[in-house]
Amino acid sequence: MNIYQTYEPSQIRELIRKKEITGPTAGLAEGYAQANLMIVKKELAFDFLLFCQRNPAACPLLDVLEPGDPVPRKSAPKADIRTDFPKYRIYRKGILQEEVSDISAYWEDDMVAFLIGCSFTFEHALMLNDIPVRHIENGHNVPMYQTNIACKRAGVFHGPMVVSMRPIPAHQITRSVQVTSRFPSVHGGPIHIGDPAMIGIANVDQPDFGETSVIKEGEVPVFWACGVTPQAVVMHTKPEIAITHAPGHMFITDQRDQQLGVL
């Protein structure tokens, strides 16, 4: 068992601020919702808000912060999004410039932060149903892939959907769809089951983000829309600056995962 599995979200965030947790967050603070990050300048914030509204599977919004305010008052009112992710990415004109563990030096008064639901949230529910989650079992980051599925454009924002993949035993696929469909605020049910080539993935063993998960005999690759989609969109849109989380390195909110369930 991961030693941080039973920690409270505030404890995890404190350890992240202290740089004692620096890796992927799958399995941490079990039972609490996790979130992806997208930060843009205020002048682009409405376009991105509209992008999320038009692409709810990939970008389900959990929280939108006021311009210049780094405190997610809805999802974790004592947190600071500048310090409470294990790792961030700085993009300039669509190019990844660097990865950092603190964005305080990059934060500006006209920046707007968006917290987007993460599928790590429903993994606890999968495991409660005895459905294996390979990347948690093996202690690595979830594999993520850029697809040939185009997101609906909103203002300047456009680009392909990114998906995460979990190998599911064939006899448990129906149950995995039922379980995850309860959580539309964190991507909901899968968007594709089976042949990766049908959604533009040439080699499932070579993810664009994260790390490879072994697909065992009798298992089927199942794909969910992913909150790394905004990073693919940033690469296409090329804003002057955008700040995101590093894939797999999420924000732990104070919201219980079951609070986001619809059934």
Swiss-Prot record:
Q: Which PANTHER family match?
A: D-GLUTAMATE CYCLASE, MITOCHONDRIAL (PTHR32022:SF10)
Q: Which organism is it from?
A: Bacillus pumilus (strain SAFR-032)
UniProt xrefs under NCBIfam families: PRK05463.1
Q: Which InterPro entries does the UniProt entry name for this protein?
A: D-Glu_cyclase, Putative_hydro-lyase, UPF0317
Q: Which Gene3D superfamilies match?
A: PSTPO5379-like, PSTPO5379-like domain
Query: What are the disulfide bonds?
Result: none
TM region positions? none
Q: Which residues form a coiled coil?
A: none
Keyword annotations of the record: Lyase
Q: Name one GO molecular function term.
A: lyase activity
Q: Which EC numbers does the record give?
A: 4.2.1.-
For this chain, the family text in UniProt reads: Belongs to the D-glutamate cyclase family.
Protein name (database record): Putative hydro-lyase BPUM_0381
List the Pfam families.
D-Glu_cyclase
